[in-house]
């Protein structure tokens, strides 16, 4: 699944396998490679979806509740990966209800009573 997302970009099978293996390991999914989607948990499916989105190294990442289906521990790991990507000059825009993750943002907007307002940003 992740491999095909990479293969669609440059048609280099060896590179696609290498990149897919690397990102799958980073999301802790190495032991799930031979499983069908119906055999995976919601959190595992969410991590695969994120892996597919990230494998081609987009400059801009737009994510709506990227950790919504994940337990707190796995969610923290996903945000660590996203934070590392940010340091590689990638723009990451995400919506979240999780205050901890919202506070990790450099710039934050909040919706209060149906109105979008700027909020305190991290320095």
Q: For each of these PLM feature ranges, what is it?
A:
Residues 3, 14-31:
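Conserved ABC ATPase "signature" region
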Residues 35, 55-56, 88:
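Conserved signature/switch motifs of ABC ATPase nucleotide-binding domains
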Residues 36-40, 44-46:
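Conserved ABC ATPase signature
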Residues 61-64:
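Catalytic Walker B motif of ABC-type/P-loop ATPase nucleotide-binding domains
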Residues 72-74:
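Helix N-cap at the start of a conserved alpha-helix in ABC-type nucleotide-binding domains
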Residues 76-87:
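Helical segment within the ABC ATPase nucleotide-binding domain
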Residues 90-95:
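Conserved H-loop
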